Amino acid sequence: MDFEDDYVHSTCRGAYQDFNGMDRDYGPGSYGGLDRDYGHGSYGGQRSMDSYLNQSYGMDNHSGGGGGSRFGPYESYDSRSSLGGRDLYRSGYGFNEPEQTRFGGSYGGRFESSYRNSLDSFGGRNQGGSSWEAPYSRSKLRPGFMEDRGRENYSSYSSFSSPHMKPAPVGSRGRGTPAYPESTFGSRSYDAFGGPSTGRGRGRGHMGDFGSFHRPGIIVDYQNKPANVTIATARGIKRKMMQIFIKPGGAFIKKPKLAKPMDKMNLSKSPTKTDPKNEEEEKRRIEARREKQRRRREKNSEKYGDGYRMAFTCSFCKFRTFEEKDIELHLESSSHQETLDHIQKQTKFDKVVMEFLHECMVNKFKKASIRKQQTLNHPEAYKIIEKDIMEGVTADDHMMKVETVHCSACSVYIPALHSSVQLHLKSPDHSKGKQAYKEQIKRESVLTATSILNNPIVKARYERFVKGENPFEIQDHPQDQQIEGDEEDEEKIDEPIEEEEEEEEEEEEEGEEAGSVEEEGDVEGEEGTAEAAAAGEADAVGEAEGAGEAEEAEEEEEEEGTQEFAAQACATEQCEHRQM
């Protein structure tokens, strides 16, 4: 029996030496050449391999163990030993461990009680080998990184809770990441002991007496560094403190931001009323903008012909046609009335204002009809346009004029064939585009209505309309002079004031952050502007902005109409399409 024991002992010792490359005694009280006896809370006293094997195989009983005496001190069986990634005989605690004094003074025997099993399950101890091999040098960890009192101040987890509930007690902020001196905020990728963290650890309570046990790492006494503890605690609660003050005031922070550009505009434009130099510069700028608008219209006329301005449009419904009957039916249709009702609901305008807006569209249709009639009275101009359409086209180009159908919702041209139109009507793309386009029309109709009411010319007409007069009445002037005067008024409404447009676009971009709250505020402000116009009060800045907004809406309509006009080719309603 002695021979067999000696053989087993020598074989085991040789295997250990080959595995570690050096002669080590893996007794429960030793690690890396340092002899420890955790059972008695002191160093020294190298234990023999005989005593270790006898203890491991249950051949020798020690006091204080009970059922767990067959396992060595601090080597009670748990899920750690069944997982790979570490030495199965390596002690679970490394250098500089305070457990030898804390647990040695708190518990008796060899610490084989249920507390040992409970404590061993904490902090990712059973997460495999990743929690036993530190990938980073301990010297790089922030001082006090693993100190227990830093966790005591803001951890609400109990010391004997489930391992799935308690986070790994690493990192000063409880996020499972160490703070390295190389980076201000530390890395967010790895756990201090390798592998992922077991939890975020956002608790803010106090730990129990046993929940603040040490983990392997550098131990620093925080009693000499109270400032660090305060900083760590303040760091943990800083975000919640910020949210308390930011969230309630979030809606109020944007309003001053939106008001600042208006204040700047008022301050910059108020001197123009008294400074003649600024007035001259403003006039030159306006003339330059008008000239640019004329060049733009000439360019569109050269590209699409003059007929694109002959279309009948409804600015609110984005309806466009070349037939008088169609526009007449639209202005009396339920869809047009629904758009007006939506505008009234969003803007809170009274019935008189809505009637005035409807009359504006009717008057626009009448003026377009007069312009078109005058154009048709000069057939030579129409022939020139028709000739220019096919100019340069030869038989080798394989091009011809065909009739098409334009879908504004999908922005596509469809061949004027029954099968093609029906196929597009039943397509899912058209169904989705139709709903989206309808919502877009409703949103833009509100902006168009408020922009029109801000125009100074429209304000004057509204004042006459409220008094019971007809602001669109055609007087007994010669027809040519009346049309010229109306066109001048329309040009004033349509003239772009591009600098104001840019400022308005910036305000709109900022206003989108505020959402519907800002939109309602703008609408109410514009309603007040309309009422002020009825009383004869007009603000210079508001007039300039209104003119720019009205012109912008009209220009968008004209740009949209150019594509449709190109498809219909003036009165013939035809466009060019390539046939290969």
From Swiss-Prot:
<feature type="cross-link" description="Glycyl lysine isopeptide (Lys-Gly) (interchain with G-Cter in SUMO2)">
    <location>
        <position position="467"/>
    </location>
</feature>
<feature type="modified residue" description="Omega-N-methylarginine">
    <location>
        <position position="235"/>
    </location>
</feature>
<feature type="modified residue" description="Phosphoserine">
    <location>
        <position position="81"/>
    </location>
</feature>
<feature type="cross-link" description="Glycyl lysine isopeptide (Lys-Gly) (interchain with G-Cter in SUMO2)">
    <location>
        <position position="240"/>
    </location>
</feature>
<feature type="cross-link" description="Glycyl lysine isopeptide (Lys-Gly) (interchain with G-Cter in SUMO2)">
    <location>
        <position position="254"/>
    </location>
</feature>
<dbReference type="Pfam" id="PF04988">
    <property type="entry name" value="AKAP95"/>
</dbReference>
<keyword id="KW-0539">Nucleus</keyword>
<keyword id="KW-0804">Transcription</keyword>
<feature type="region of interest" description="Disordered">
    <location>
        <begin position="470"/>
        <end position="580"/>
    </location>
</feature>
<protein>
    <recommendedName>
        <fullName>DBIRD complex subunit ZNF326</fullName>
    </recommendedName>
</protein>
<feature type="modified residue" description="Phosphoserine">
    <location>
        <position position="48"/>
    </location>
</feature>
<feature type="compositionally biased region" description="Basic and acidic residues">
    <location>
        <begin position="272"/>
        <end position="290"/>
    </location>
</feature>
<keyword id="KW-0832">Ubl conjugation</keyword>
<keyword id="KW-0479">Metal-binding</keyword>
<feature type="cross-link" description="Glycyl lysine isopeptide (Lys-Gly) (interchain with G-Cter in SUMO2)">
    <location>
        <position position="264"/>
    </location>
</feature>
<keyword id="KW-0238">DNA-binding</keyword>
<dbReference type="GO" id="GO:0003677">
    <property type="term" value="F:DNA binding"/>
</dbReference>
<feature type="cross-link" description="Glycyl lysine isopeptide (Lys-Gly) (interchain with G-Cter in SUMO2)">
    <location>
        <position position="401"/>
    </location>
</feature>
<feature type="modified residue" description="Phosphoserine">
    <location>
        <position position="56"/>
    </location>
</feature>
<keyword id="KW-0862">Zinc</keyword>
<feature type="cross-link" description="Glycyl lysine isopeptide (Lys-Gly) (interchain with G-Cter in SUMO2)">
    <location>
        <position position="459"/>
    </location>
</feature>
<feature type="modified residue" description="Phosphoserine">
    <location>
        <position position="212"/>
    </location>
</feature>
<feature type="compositionally biased region" description="Acidic residues">
    <location>
        <begin position="483"/>
        <end position="529"/>
    </location>
</feature>
<keyword id="KW-0805">Transcription regulation</keyword>
<feature type="region of interest" description="Disordered">
    <location>
        <begin position="156"/>
        <end position="196"/>
    </location>
</feature>
<feature type="zinc finger region" description="C2H2 AKAP95-type 1">
    <location>
        <begin position="314"/>
        <end position="336"/>
    </location>
</feature>
<feature type="modified residue" description="Phosphoserine">
    <location>
        <position position="106"/>
    </location>
</feature>
<comment type="subunit">
    <text>Component of the DBIRD complex. Interacts with CCAR2; the interaction is direct.</text>
</comment>
<feature type="modified residue" description="Phosphoserine">
    <location>
        <position position="69"/>
    </location>
</feature>
<feature type="zinc finger region" description="C2H2 AKAP95-type 2">
    <location>
        <begin position="407"/>
        <end position="430"/>
    </location>
</feature>
<dbReference type="GO" id="GO:0006397">
    <property type="term" value="P:mRNA processing"/>
</dbReference>
<feature type="modified residue" description="Phosphoserine">
    <location>
        <position position="137"/>
    </location>
</feature>
<dbReference type="InterPro" id="IPR034736">
    <property type="entry name" value="ZF_C2H2_AKAP95"/>
</dbReference>
<feature type="compositionally biased region" description="Acidic residues">
    <location>
        <begin position="540"/>
        <end position="562"/>
    </location>
</feature>
<feature type="modified residue" description="Phosphoserine">
    <location>
        <position position="118"/>
    </location>
</feature>
<keyword id="KW-0007">Acetylation</keyword>
<dbReference type="GO" id="GO:0045893">
    <property type="term" value="P:positive regulation of DNA-templated transcription"/>
</dbReference>
<dbReference type="GO" id="GO:0008380">
    <property type="term" value="P:RNA splicing"/>
</dbReference>
<dbReference type="GO" id="GO:0005634">
    <property type="term" value="C:nucleus"/>
</dbReference>
<dbReference type="GO" id="GO:0000993">
    <property type="term" value="F:RNA polymerase II complex binding"/>
</dbReference>
<feature type="modified residue" description="Omega-N-methylarginine">
    <location>
        <position position="173"/>
    </location>
</feature>
<feature type="modified residue" description="Phosphoserine">
    <location>
        <position position="82"/>
    </location>
</feature>
